[in-house]
């Protein structure tokens, strides 16, 4: 009797689970980054599957910039309570003390201090030697050339010209003291794969991904949701309730919504089949300068 062939999603799932298990076995102190978005939700689901019926044997880390959507924070805390995983939350205390924010310091400086430097602080504080991330190669060109095991030096910086070969899904995890790796189990997934897997597995998501009426202002060609009273209105701006959803999530002043009527998973998948634009076009931090994502990654960003 012929062995049952795995579907495309089953193959991706098996590959990701194998990577998660291998890192958990090989490294002394791994951690899973948890940004609360759809990719993080899929990665969390895969980690739960990888070690079922036991608990996930490593903590989840959220680097909180203090500017995330309120719904994201509520969802994060609800997921930790429901599934019982260890959740670590880190805010850059220096950035908080300086009052760093996207309006006072600009998107580039805010991202560097609150996300990149905050992440490096947390990794140093807890001594993690491997950190899982939900990045995919189809997202952005600098991520397209990054390995599944992405090596970082003692300063957490990345050298794209000095990456190790990964042949036949064989990964070299040897690191020197003080070095670490970033691990991307979803490297070979596409955005459509993610949505189809979410539908197949009935994975719960932040409601921001689904279309509904939300208060937004149009600014610099993007629709920014008014999530709290810290968003200052510029001259001539008015807040309007529009039927929108978010394709990607980050700090709310730096994340653009899109017009959409997709309020179910089926409608979102149908929308994805027709779209011809990048999901990260709604992320202001990616347009700070040419090759901005690669520069951020070289400096220690995920």
Swiss-Prot record:
GO biological process: hydrogen sulfide biosynthetic process; sulfate assimilation
Catalytic activity: sulfate + ATP + H(+) = adenosine 5'-phosphosulfate + diphosphate
EC annotation from Swiss-Prot or TrEMBL: 2.7.7.4
UniProt key word Transferase: yes
Disulfide topology: none
GO function terms (MF aspect): ATP binding; sulfate adenylyltransferase (ATP) activity
Pathway listed: Sulfur metabolism; hydrogen sulfide biosynthesis; sulfite from sulfate: step 1/3
InterPro entries membership: PAPS_reduct_dom, Rossmann-like_a/b/a_fold, SO4_adenylTrfase_ssu, Sulfate_adenylyltrnsfr_sub2
The keyword Secreted is annotated on this UniProt entry: no
Keywords: ATP-binding, Nucleotide-binding, Nucleotidyltransferase, Transferase
Recorded coiled-coil stretches: none
Enzyme class: transferase
Superkingdom of the source species: Bacteria
Role, per record: With CysN forms the ATP sulfurylase (ATPS) that catalyzes the adenylation of sulfate producing adenosine 5'-phosphosulfate (APS) and diphosphate, the first enzymatic step in sulfur assimilation pathway. APS synthesis involves the formation of a high-energy phosphoric-sulfuric acid anhydride bond driven by GTP hydrolysis by CysN coupled to ATP hydrolysis by CysD.
Subunit and interaction comment: Heterodimer composed of CysD, the smaller subunit, and CysN.
PANTHER family reported for this sequence: SULFATE ADENYLYLTRANSFERASE SUBUNIT 2
Record-given protein name: Sulfate adenylyltransferase subunit 2
Organism of derivation: Shewanella piezotolerans (strain WP3 / JCM 13877)
Lineage of source species: Bacteria, Pseudomonadati, Pseudomonadota, Gammaproteobacteria, Alteromonadales
